[in-house]
Amino acid sequence: MTLTTMNILLAFFFSLLGTLIFRSHLMSTLLCLEGMMLSLFIMTTITALDTQSMVMYTIPITTLVFAACEAAVGLALLTMVSNTYGTDHVQNLNLLQC
């Protein structure tokens, strides 16, 4: 395992740990999820460059598409919860259930 791969895996696991620790605030959780998506993007890009397969070149772009969709939905949810309740606590999301 190279040093670059180890650093990317550590970044992913620290973002995962941050998601578990800061799960009470939606903004912190969204930032940690973005860190996870960034490390996944870098890892898939490195893997695509190492394998030099034409099929693998589409995976990093697909990862970016999913990250953009996740960020848009997260920001919309954060804006709605902040405007409605005045805070970004995740416990307020239980009130949004049907």
From Swiss-Prot:
Gene3D superfamilies: 1.10.287.3510. It catalyses: a ubiquinone + NADH + 5 H(+)(in) = a ubiquinol + NAD(+) + 4 H(+)(out). Keywords: Electron transport, Membrane, Mitochondrion, Mitochondrion inner membrane, NAD, Respiratory chain, Translocase, Transmembrane, Transmembrane helix, Transport, Ubiquinone. InterPro entries: NADH_UbQ_OxRdtase_chain4L/K (IPR001133), NUOK/Mnh_C1-like (IPR039428). It is a multi-pass membrane protein. One of its GO terms (cellular component) is mitochondrial inner membrane. One of its GO terms (biological process) is ATP synthesis coupled electron transport. Pfam families: Oxidored_q2. GO terms for molecular function: NADH dehydrogenase (ubiquinone) activity. The keyword Membrane applies. Its EC number is 7.1.1.2. It is found in: Mitochondrion inner membrane. It is an enzyme of class 7 (translocase). Core subunit of the mitochondrial membrane respiratory chain NADH dehydrogenase (Complex I) which catalyzes electron transfer from NADH through the respiratory chain, using ubiquinone as an electron acceptor. Part of the enzyme membrane arm which is embedded in the lipid bilayer and involved in proton translocation. Belongs to the complex I subunit 4L family. Core subunit of respiratory chain NADH dehydrogenase (Complex I) which is composed of 45 different subunits. This is NADH-ubiquinone oxidoreductase chain 4L. It comes from Oxymycterus rufus. The lineage of its organism: Eukaryota, Metazoa, Chordata, Craniata, Vertebrata.
